């Protein structure tokens, strides 16, 4: 397996995948410009044992929450992509449950949302609107993953060569015994794999029919509150085995009739069986703040107007996945008024001008406009 992963063809194909969308970056340009020579050098280094994993750089991510991630050298990204695509991913995901929805080919947020609606409709046809939702969110999932647990999972599910190469990369890039910073595909695979035994436990031991896990977010639908409390308690016990704990604010049991929030959308099941799926209010608020900053930059000539439209169209495409017609109409009107200057005029504050250094000004016009919408 090692010979296949480090072969010229495998590494070259991995380079072609890794460069998509990032060829404008200088390190990528430099590597790809002499791609054949660099790939051949990598191949020989793996053959004669002189290959060394590079040191990643820490970068700060601020949205949707502040956290640290790792930026990996391009040559290491090529090598890791070859491991993932040719061996690690196929072997690790082979035993996943259908309801494990994150970071897999043919799956993702859209798949998970569709599965939620499918489960809700199936449940409604059997039991109506009476039911209970169990939601569990793990606090600091990546930062609290034990290295020994991840390596044990890889060792149990993959061949010897894949285990040695994968664990070697993780050990070189992450010091200590606990915690991984997101930023590489290999860490994502570790994230979706670590709790695979818990997925099977929920399905096969607790006999839960309607359950979904998206990375560290659990969504479970059961018939009675007693069942919900039992499932919730068992999940808490299982998480302790992995040294993980639930986020108290985001982990709870709620009646199905009250609705719930999952993956950025609010869901509500009506008495007639209709599933109402609306965009989370936090997303709308964030979009409005972003539009204020971008429009002001555009008015100062620092940003092309087309970039504002491109950003907003992307947000609308996501909103279209739910019942968001009225929200879209209000946001479009808000954007038009921003461009006309009816709400803000020349008044700008630090948050509106992306840190331009100006002092804060009264926001009465802005508050009045938001009240109207």
Region locations from a protein language model:
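Surface-exposed helix-capping loop/turn segments at secondary-structure junctions
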Residues: 93-94, 204-210, 243-247
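Short Gly/Ser/Thr- and Asp/Glu-enriched loop/turn motifs at secondary-structure junctions
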Residues: 56, 212-216, 248-249
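PAPS/PAP-binding and catalytic site of the sulfotransferase fold
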Residues: 83-86, 235, 239
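Right-hand nucleic-acid polymerase module
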Residues: 72-73, 77, 81, 172-176, ...
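Conserved polymerase palm-domain catalytic core
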Residues: 45, 114-215, 219-238, 254
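Short, residue-level hotspots on alpha-helical faces of the histone-fold
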Residues: 81, 85, 192-197, 250
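Beta-rich nucleic-acid/ligand-interaction surfaces
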Residues: 102-111, 219-221, 253-259
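Conserved two-metal-ion catalytic palm core of "right-hand" nucleic acid polymerases
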Residues: 1-150, 158, 170-174, 365, ...
